[in-house]
């Protein structure tokens, strides 16, 4: 059998969140957005990704800046990860034999 608080508390919380809280928040809502004069803001902010004046700052698929070309001296200092992984696999196979 379930104890009384284990049954009553979730039931009261459900009733509070579904029915009582929305009614109370209509008349007293401390989390409402207000402007500097204390008036409630009814309208939300504009969509920030609109193109205004024929210029759109957020173009999908825009080109990313390319890195400077890497010379052969820099490649030897930083070998690709695949080469490192291949070398470790070869070393491990030699250890097993």
From Swiss-Prot:
It comes from the Eukaryota. Transmembrane segments: none annotated. It holds the Pfam family DUF4512. Residues 64-97 are annotated as: Disordered. The keyword Phosphoprotein applies. The modification Phosphoserine is found at residue 69. Keywords: Phosphoprotein. Belongs to the UPF0729 family. This is UPF0729 protein GD16342. It comes from Drosophila simulans.
């Amino acid at each position: 059998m379930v104890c009384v608080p284990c049954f009553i508390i979730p039931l009261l919380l459900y009733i509070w969140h579904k029915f009582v809280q929305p009614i109370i928040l209509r008349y007293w809502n401390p989390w409402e957005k207000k402007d500097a004069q204390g008036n409630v803001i009814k309208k939300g902010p504009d969509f920030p990704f609109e193109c205004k004046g024929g210029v759109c700052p957020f173009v999908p698929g825009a080109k990313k800046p390319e890195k400077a070309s890497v010379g052969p001296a820099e490649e030897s200092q930083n070998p690709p990860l695949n080469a490192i992984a291949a070398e470790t696999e070869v070393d491990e196979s030699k250890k097993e034999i």
